[in-house]
Amino acid sequence: KRVRRHRGPGMRAIGLAALALAADRTNRPTNIDPEEIDSVVRVAEAVQSRSESAIRAVTKEWLERAHRGAGYAENAAQFMSALGRLDEAFAVLRAYYFSEGFDCGEVRFERATGSFTPRNDRQTAILFNPAMAPLRRDERFTALIMKLGLPDYWRASGRKPDYLA
């Protein structure tokens, strides 16, 4: 029952069936701390219920997690975007890409896993995941991608970004 230690399930997979699978504790991966799975389950429950108190609670939890690692920050930004917490999502992304507000560091999740995301090699693909659609519709997204230099990349490649096609 070992699985790859990637904790970013993406919001596409979250639904009632996913919640039912997560509730089956006997078949969960044995190499991931149950609290890590539970933290994502709480996000899925907030997405399903749209309960303001649940959304507030997972936003607070994942803001705290974002301070502990780059992988947590990637997940936090996606979760917050999907939950409509765009101010918080942008704050996490500013920390992740530019160390503004706080520094999420280079460790992805836990130092023991030996997985790192160097500050000079941050992932940009997460910006185009389905969970980030609300974020992309916000005017601050253009400023973010400009600061990251993505329009220069697209111009040089001669291709339009997929999300604008």
How should these model regions be labeled?
Residues 1-165:
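Alpha-helical protein-protein interaction modules
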